[in-house]
């Protein structure tokens, strides 16, 4: 149990350190992926900013189910959940003030669109050790399971 909590914290710290991620939405019934940046993390909540004029904003309004993937040095973290648009003004202001790119692109935070992702499921995959580590965390139910990492390490 304690090992699982530690592994989950390792995965969340990985997101802090690798905040440029692949972000997947749906455009109609087709998947659409782009590079996005996690602007802030509070526990299991990830915050994002975009323009209300961008396609991603319209896609999220139509279908708030998303998945994201961070990857570096043989480690990947994949998160899944449903975004919501209830972001406090103080968080919006903090995001705008603490990201130098946003102030170059936008006059103020008030004209931007913000959303957050409460992580429902998280996969942590590390290919470095033998056998590799693959943990699946369901943060809604609290269940933790080991994922399939290859036939050589399949449970018998």
Indicate where each model-derived feature is located.
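General beta-strand recognition
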Residues: 22, 46-47, 78, 123
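A short, Trp-centered hydrophobic/proline-enriched beta-strand micro-motif
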Residues: 13-28, 66-70
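N-terminal leader/targeting segments and the immediate start of mature chains
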Residues: 1-19, 152-153
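A short mixed-secondary-structure module that forms the rim of ligand-binding clefts
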Residues: 39-74
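Conserved beta-strand in the GNAT
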Residues: 35-37
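Charged, gly/pro-rich active-site loop segments
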Residues: 2, 78-156
């Amino acid at each position: 149990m304690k090992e699982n909590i530690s592994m989950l914290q390792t995965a969340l710290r990985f997101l802090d350190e690798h905040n440029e991620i692949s972000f997947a939405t749906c455009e109609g019934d087709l998947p659409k992926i782009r590079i996005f940046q996690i602007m802030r993390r509070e526990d299991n909540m990830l915050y994002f900013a975009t323009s209300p004029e961008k396609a991603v904003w319209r896609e999220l309004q139509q279908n708030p189910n998303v998945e994201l993937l961070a990857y570096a040095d043989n480690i990947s973290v994949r998160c899944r959940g449903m975004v919501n648009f209830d972001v406090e003004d103080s968080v919006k202001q903090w995001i705008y003030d603490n990201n130098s790119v946003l102030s170059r692109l936008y006059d103020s935070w008030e004209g931007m669109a913000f959303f957050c992702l409460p992580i429902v499921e998280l996969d942590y995959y590390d290919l470095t050790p033998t056998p590799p580590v693959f943990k699946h965390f369901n943060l809604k139910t609290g269940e933790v399971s080991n994922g399939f990492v290859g036939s050589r390490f399949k449970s018998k």
